[in-house]
Regions:
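Long, histidine/aromatic-enriched segments associated with O2/redox biology
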Residues: 1-313
């Protein structure tokens, strides 16, 4: 089956002005009752999007909803499993590890109006709240000029247009789950005081790009462990990509400043390789960043959501 972008969820780079990431655990008290709610949610989620989009005159609304491996096995024990959906166990690094945080359900809502984001999440949670508990809820925002909270432009090397589809959406290599995607969600907190104390030239060496012009440095200008050096997957002399967003979040009164990384990928193995390289090759950005969470989810296609709604999985 060929990829049909009209049948994918919103797994492309459209960070939005207002962002909500919510991860949930199922109560696991009554599987049949919980499955019924999930089936209802799968049926309603696109209707909620259409309704709110009409009332809000668009506002750039995007929604992605997905399942962890444990949730998939619990809810759909007799169904086939997406080929690369695994129970994420974390990644061992040299100085820091990628933590694995238990979660069953993933919700990523973004729009250009905070009231729209709130309305969508609130309506979805009306259904999910009785059968779940919240693992994490993070509210992100659009930072100046589309920059990450570390003040560098975000996503310059992201695949775009057809290339984004090729790297972000499952194809015919897994025909039962074509048009789906693998989402890796990871929350970081930064020591921005220490980061901002660095000279701009040092920050640029550690990132691999100019801070203000966003021009990539020459290889000999970069630190050997620069972020845009070690965070790549260049196996077989080919650059493998994902669709990534680094969404700023903060509680300034508490001194908390961070990034919520979300990577949508056709191949989870690509994201995993990038993370492994970062943490085993001591990405310089990690000297100023602490990983808080790590979670892998499968984002079903609209056809798979329809099958869930109809009880066909």
């Amino acid at each position: 089956m060929a990829v049909d972008v009209s049948r994918t969820q919103d797994v492309y780079k459209d960070a939005g002005q207002s962002v909500n990431f919510t991860t949930l655990l199922l109560n696991r008290k009554d599987r049949d009752a919980e499955l019924e709610v999930i089936q209802d949610m799968a049926d309603r989620i696109q209707a909620i999007k259409r309704s709110v989009s009409i009332r809000a005159n668009g506002e750039g609304l995007g929604i992605a909803f997905g399942f962890s491996r444990k949730a998939w096995d619990y809810l759909f024990p007799n169904a086939p499993v997406p080929k690369e959906l695994e129970d994420f166990q974390g990644i061992k690094g040299d100085k820091q590890d990628v933590p694995a945080v238990a979660a069953d359900l993933f919700l990523h809502v973004r729009s250009n109006d905070e009231s729209v984001t709130y309305t969508v999440v609130d309506q979805i949670m009306e259904f999910l709240r009785p059968i779940t508990s919240v693992v994490d809820e993070t509210h992100g925002f659009h930072y100046e000029q589309g920059r990450a909270i570390i003040d560098f432009v975000d996503g310059t090397e992201n695949p775009v247009s057809q290339e984004a589809v090729e790297w972000g959406v499952i194809g015919d290599e897994d025909p039962e789950f074509t048009n789906g995607s693998y989402a890796f969600a990871q929350k970081y907190e930064h020591d921005l005081d220490a980061w901002r104390a660095l000279p701009t030239e040092m920050q640029e060496k550690f990132i691999g790009r100019r801070k203000f012009s966003d021009i990539e440095l020459e290889d000999d200008e970069k630190d050997p462990a620069a972020h845009n050096v070690v965070s790549q997957d260049n196996r077989d002399d080919k650059e493998h990509k994902i669709v990534r967003m680094n969404v700023p979040f903060a509680q300034p009164g508490q001194g908390v400043r961070g990034t919520y990384f979300i990577g949508y990928a056709r191949y989870w193995d690509v994201t995993k390789t990038m993370l492994t390289n970062m943490f085993t090759q001591n990405d310089k950005l990690l000297d100023y960043s602490k990983p808080i969470t790590g979670m892998l989810f499968f984002i079903p296609s609209l056809d798979t959501l329809d099958a869930i709604a109809e009880g066909e999985l």
